Amino acid sequence: MEKTLHKVGVGLGWDPNANGGENFDLDASAFMLGKNKKTPADKFFVFYNNPVSQDGAVSSSGDDRTGGNSADGDDETLTVNLDGVAPSIEEIVFIASIYEAEKRRQNFGQVRNAYIRIYNAETNEEIARYDLEEDFSIETVVEFGRLYRRNNEWRFEAMGIGSKNGLESLVAKYMN
């Protein structure tokens, strides 16, 4: 990742359910982790019920419950001000998940044009992108990638780890 990067965005996009039935409610979230690979406090987990991190460095555009916020662009966005991240945070893991996927019997393979991407928020240059519909067709949650500190600069690593166990499994993994 370029050294001069100060602000990144994580965009999640998808099309509304055109086939009837339950809406597809995809969510973008972030776990801000300390040295022990856990969130130091609950407010370092940014999601629909906590739209701004404790340090104010990560914020959410809000919860789009249908995929109808944009015609072809991002429906939900996380914005990260890298210069404002608390010194105790060593990495930020970005997640795409389907709300109540098990109850609604949904997975990414059913959601048309679903993607998650990370980009330089100052230039809009895309750094990485996953097509959720194809790459994670049977999953309900994806650990997309992580920003991590190395020698006082932020770097990005794609992860691409999908699961059928929902966001709850990652809350158990990353929360103290």
Predicted segments with their positions:
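Intrinsic-disorder/low-complexity signal
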Residues: 1-176
